[in-house]
Regions:
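Radical SAM/AdoMet-radical enzyme domain recognition
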Residues: 2-128
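Histidine/acidic residue-rich metal-binding segments in metalloenzymes
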Residues: 82, 141, 145
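Short, acidic, Ser/Thr-enriched surface-loop or helix-capping motifs
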Residues: 191
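Flexible glycine/acidic-rich beta-alpha junction loops that bind and position SAM and/or redox cofactors
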Residues: 63-68, 123-142, 162-176, 203-211
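Short, small/polar residue-rich loop motifs at catalytic or cofactor-binding pockets
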Residues: 181-185
């Protein structure tokens, strides 16, 4: 309902102010698919599907997905997510895929990407989570899985794009040392109460109110970087570079 209200307001203002952006607008978001078939969600999809770009997060094969994505009752969420993916694919041609791996899930990397390619996905974004501690043996296992995946892709789907195999990955860093992620304050995330955070990963929904309060950058009511503490946080974020994150 909130997304619908925001969309309604945006398109109404485009019309009222004679702003020509409406036909070119995309409302892009990812979902875990658990509420996909509720009346509220279906109403939004039917109403705005021509402007929507929706990704259903499926981490891979059922064993992998259910091991790391569970619902409030502790049950695996693959079946609902997969049904949502199939519905979006069949009705609207939405086939984007986003996968996140950790050391414990590396053994599923090849079969998981293979599954989504065979489902028709031609552009798959996948990466490893930043939080876990990685060992040299973890790197060796990732390499072995990527070799298997690459060999299969060359034969079965040579034109498909898998981000973890993107050519520049692993090459030397160029002259531009700017942080490549918007999570240092270049792409703010706003919570429902109007407070601003450097990224959704720093918002209360991700790390809880106590931790999130330490990196709050202001709000839509009081402005950004209005206090000394907020300005110090901005200074810290601005100092983050690609090389500083790798050292």
């Amino acid at each position: 309902q909130l997304i619908e209200r925001i969309g309604d307001y945006y398109f109404e203002q485009c019309f009222r102010r004679d702003i020509p952006l409406a036909p070119y607008t995309r409302i892009s978001f990812a979902t875990n698919g658990q509420l996909w078939f509720t009346e509220e969600a279906q109403h939004l999809i039917r109403k705005y599907h021509e402007f929507l770009s929706v990704t259903v997060s499926i981490d891979g094969v059922k064993e992998l997905h259910d091991a790391f994505r569970v619902d409030a009752e502790g049950n695996g969420s693959f079946d609902k997510a997969y049904a949502a993916f199939q519905d979006g694919k069949q009705k609207y041609g939405w086939m984007a895929s986003k996968m996140t791996f950790v050391p414990e899930s590396t053994k599923y990397l090849y079969p998981s990407v293979k599954m989504m390619v065979e489902e028709g996905c031609q552009h798959i974004n996948c990466n490893y989570a930043y939080e876990p501690y990685y060992t040299v043996e973890d790197a060796r296992e990732v390499y072995r899985e990527l070799v298997k995946l690459s060999d299969w892709l060359i034969e079965a789907a040579p034109d498909d794009y898998v981000s973890i195999l993107h050519a520049p990955v692993g090459t030397g860093m160029g002259c531009d040392d700017r942080n490549y992620c918007g999570g240092t304050g270049n792409m703010l995330s706003f919570a429902p109460d109007g407070k601003a955070y450097p990224c959704i990963r720093y918002a209360p929904i991700s790390i809880g109110e106590e931790k999130a309060s330490r990196v709050c950058l202001g709000s839509c009511w009081d402005g950004l970087y209005a206090t000394d503490e907020q300005r110090k946080t901005k200074e810290m974020l601005d100092s983050i570079t690609r090389s500083s994150q790798s050292s």
